[in-house]
């Protein structure tokens, strides 16, 4: 019984020390931390937005070979299942690479 009371007291002390609400947890005094779209769009200028879109298009055009192989494998269900077990490289080699001796 004494150990149960001691355990309850230790648990209560742990709750008090760990759940203490300090001033640091109240750093933001705003009631609503979210902003509307108009104010959110003022952070990035239209020029930066345009530049980001252009860079994204360039990245889409010049994808690495392994990513193109993975996308090809994702479109074919058997290849995708095989890839879940053996990996995308092995699956692509099995289903899409030309076999030796065939033209």
Curated annotation (Swiss-Prot):
It comes from the Eukaryota. Disulfide bonds join 73-79. Residues 97-103 form a propeptide. Keywords: Chondrogenesis, Deafness, Developmental protein, Differentiation, Disulfide bond, Gamma-carboxyglutamic acid, Osteogenesis, Phosphoprotein, Secreted, Signal. The modification 4-carboxyglutamate is found at residues 21, 56, 60, 67, 71. Residues 51-97 form the Gla domain. Requires vitamin K-dependent gamma-carboxylation for its function. One of its GO terms (biological process) is cell differentiation. The modification Phosphoserine is found at residues 22, 25, 28. InterPro entries: GLA-like_dom_SF, GLA_domain, MGP, Osteocalcin/MGP. It is found in: Secreted. Residues 1-19 form the signal peptide. PANTHER family: MATRIX GLA PROTEIN. Belongs to the osteocalcin/matrix Gla protein family. Associates with the organic matrix of bone and cartilage. Thought to act as an inhibitor of bone formation. It is linked to Keutel syndrome: An autosomal recessive disorder characterized by abnormal cartilage calcification, peripheral pulmonary stenosis neural hearing loss and midfacial hypoplasia. This is Matrix Gla protein. The gene is MGP.
């Amino acid at each position: 019984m004494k150990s149960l009371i001691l355990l309850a007291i230790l648990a209560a002390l742990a709750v008090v020390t760990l759940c203490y609400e300090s001033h640091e947890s109240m750093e933001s005094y705003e009631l609503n931390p979210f902003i509307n779209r108009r104010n959110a769009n003022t952070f990035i200028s239209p020029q930066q937005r345009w530049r980001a879109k252009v860079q994204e298009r360039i990245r889409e055009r010049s994808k690495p070979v392994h990513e193109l192989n993975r996308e090809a494998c994702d479109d074919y269900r058997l290849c995708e299942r095989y890839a879940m077990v053996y990996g995308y490289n092995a699956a692509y080699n099995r289903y899409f690479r030309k076999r030796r001796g065939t033209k």
